[in-house]
């Protein structure tokens, strides 16, 4: 990053903010080609940011900012396997997991392509064996249910993907257990049979407390129903700790590895995606990878002015840093993407929720926004009130497919799309006091009532939103969408000048929880804890004593 040039562009963008479009209605009225000017496509994916308060000057300044931040250099370093995760001295190469082409991928001078393909082939063989019934349970019955036990990136990605690709399921049912709360695994197991259930334990070190606690509960459940000798037929692992996996009772040919150059929240493309592959089959899983690789190539080669991840990141940075918007709402008008907001919470907030720059100095601008959302139209009947009339402006990101998977329900899909477009239009246009009054008078309301109620029906408008449209949520398109958001996070992290690939905030909580466990169990005193923690522990013990 050229800090001097970056500061110059930052100042220019701040000065420009007051000259950017203040009224989106007027901006569209003044420029009939505004939609064409502020949309970009890649295949059937379309990104429309024309309803955001930007103009040609804004985009030009943002492109210059990206140049000052050396976005192209950072991007090249990532794809080349340079150790851009500086706090852990690691390369960042989740993109290698979906690069099935003939080109090699180098880490520390070694081509890792063969290892990636070897794991993928092993996953495919195992998935086919489970799906076909070649690999049976201990009593000779076919596996009908898969339970993935993991947390964070070992759960959110595959759980989201399994739901997103539901129309392509032709394998065993997939379930996900992540929470240390015993209710999660209890409720999951309640409807399953040990004879026909396979557990996948996803933990790189095989020491993650939440995951291993749930795995031990699952093993006890299998042993109680089928005996200790059955464990090997009902478990698989995604891990690199082969000794601990063997000690647990999982056979070596059921262990699938991954590498430290793949961060947890970027790991769905490899062995962590095993439950997805079993559910939808290796062919559909590879289509998912192919779509992501296509987006990788687009991100690497498309000029900035038409580069979807770069544009999404530039506009996101503009909203966060220059406009000062604290959050972004992700609203998929696609029910099967209902877990996308939760997935993006980890992808974005764990990556860019940082307070120091790459050189360890405090950041001088805001960094990652709060990310949240729910699927449309559900959100319209919950929190859209705040989006339309609340005191905070929150940029909204709409996602929608032109075609659904249920042709017999086309009318419902049309209603879904109409609602999506209407919300986007309403956020942009709003409704003036005069318009509210005219509408109420036209309905025959008394003037006195109109005077009283009209102010409550005013919408300021000018609330930014962008829309991502695609033809249909198939495996390839889904892969492209997720890779699009991954690279968007990278772009924003580059502009923030932070390390988007560590997560020390996660580690702190783990450390403290380890020390607090014996205190909660009553084995150690809480005397050396702060007054609040001490008081809460005492109250827990009191409440338990009342049982």
From Swiss-Prot:
Biological process according to GO: gluconeogenesis; glucose 6-phosphate metabolic process; glycolytic process
Predominant place of localization: cytoplasm
GO molecular function: carbohydrate derivative binding; glucose-6-phosphate isomerase activity; monosaccharide binding
Metabolic or biological pathway: Carbohydrate biosynthesis; gluconeogenesis; Carbohydrate degradation; glycolysis; D-glyceraldehyde 3-phosphate and glycerone phosphate from D-glucose: step 2/4
Gene Ontology annotations for the cellular component aspect, listed alphabetically: cytosol
Keyword list, A-Z: Cytoplasm, Gluconeogenesis, Glycolysis, Isomerase
Alphabetized Pfam families for the sequence: PGI (PF00342)
Subcellular location: Cytoplasm
InterPro entries with a match to the protein in the record: G6P_Isomerase, G6P_Isomerase_C, Phosphoglucose_isomerase_CS, SIS_dom_sf, SIS_PGI_1, SIS_PGI_2
Reaction equations catalysed: alpha-D-glucose 6-phosphate = beta-D-fructose 6-phosphate
The UniProt record lists the keyword Isomerase: yes
EC number: 5.3.1.9
Active site: residue positions: 350, 381, 510
NCBIfam families: PRK00179.1
Family to which the UniProt record says this protein belongs: Belongs to the GPI family.
Matches recorded under PANTHER family: GLUCOSE-6-PHOSPHATE ISOMERASE
Function comment: Catalyzes the reversible isomerization of glucose-6-phosphate to fructose-6-phosphate.
Protein name: Glucose-6-phosphate isomerase
Lineage: Bacteria, Pseudomonadati, Pseudomonadota, Alphaproteobacteria, Hyphomicrobiales
Gene (UniProt): pgi
């Amino acid at each position: 990053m050229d800090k001097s040039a970056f500061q110059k562009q930052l100042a220019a963008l701040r000065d420009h903010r007051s000259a950017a479009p203040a009224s989106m209605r007027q901006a569209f009225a003044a420029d009939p080609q505004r939609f064409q000017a502020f949309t970009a496509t890649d295949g059937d994916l379309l990104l429309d940011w024309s309803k955001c308060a930007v103009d040609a000057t804004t985009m030009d300044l943002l492109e210059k900012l990206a140049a000052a931040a050396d976005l192209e250099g950072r991007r090249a370093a990532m794809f080349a396997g340079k150790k851009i995760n500086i706090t852990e001295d690691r390369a960042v190469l989740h993109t290698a997991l979906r690069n099935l082409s003939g080109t090699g991928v180098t880490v520390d001078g070694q081509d890792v392509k063969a290892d990636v393909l070897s794991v993928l082939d092993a996953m495919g063989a195992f998935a086919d064996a489970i799906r076909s019934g070649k690999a049976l349970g201990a009593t000779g019955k076919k596996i009908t249910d898969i339970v993935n036990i993991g947390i964070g990136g070992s759960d959110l990605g595959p759980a989201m993907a399994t739901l997103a690709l539901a129309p392509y399921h032709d394998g065993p049912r997939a379930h996900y257990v992540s929470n240390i709360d015993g209710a999660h695994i209890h409720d999951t197991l309640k409807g399953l049979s040990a004879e026909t259930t396979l557990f996948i334990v996803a933990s790189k070190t095989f020491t993650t407390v939440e995951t291993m606690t749930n795995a031990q509960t699952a093993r006890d459940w299998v042993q109680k129903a089928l005996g200790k000798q059955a464990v090997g037929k009902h478990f698989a692992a995604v891990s690199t700790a082969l000794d601990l996996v063997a000690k647990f009772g999982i056979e070596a040919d059921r262990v699938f590895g991954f590498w430290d150059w793949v961060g947890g929240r970027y790991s769905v493309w490899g062995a962590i995606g095993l439950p997805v592959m079993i559910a939808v089959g290796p062919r559909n899983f590879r289509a998912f990878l192919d779509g992501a690789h296509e987006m990788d190539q687009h991100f690497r080669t498309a000029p900035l002015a038409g580069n979807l991840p770069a544009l999404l990141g530039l506009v996101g940075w503009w909203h966060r840093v220059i406009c000062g918007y604290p959050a972004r709402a992700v609203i998929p008008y696609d029910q099967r993407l209902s877990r996308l907001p939760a997935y993006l919470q980890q992808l974005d907030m764990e990556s860019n929720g940082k307070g120091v720059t790459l050189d360890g100095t405090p950041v001088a601008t805001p960094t990652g926004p709060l990310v949240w959302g729910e699927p449309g139209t559900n959100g319209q009947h919950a929190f859209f009130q705040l989006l339309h009339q609340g005191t905070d402006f929150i940029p909204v990101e709409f996602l929608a497919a032109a075609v659904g998977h249920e042709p017999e329900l086309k009318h419902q899909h049309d209603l879904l799309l109409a609602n999506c477009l209407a919300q986007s239009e309403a956020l942009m246009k709003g409704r003036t006091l005069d318009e509210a009054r005219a509408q109420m008078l036209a309905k025959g309301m008394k003037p006195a009532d109109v005077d009283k109620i009209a102010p409550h029906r005013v919408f300021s408008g000018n609330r930014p939103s962008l829309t991502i449209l695609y033809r249909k949520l198939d495996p390839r398109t889904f892969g492209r969408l997720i890779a699009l958001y991954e690279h968007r996070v990278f772009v924003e992290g580059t502009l923030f000048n932070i390390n988007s690939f560590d997560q020390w905030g996660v580690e702190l909580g783990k450390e403290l929880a380890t020390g607090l466990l014996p205190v909660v169990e009553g084995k150690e005193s809480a005397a050396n804890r702060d007054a609040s923690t001490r008081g809460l522990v005492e109250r827990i013990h009191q409440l338990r004593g009342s049982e």
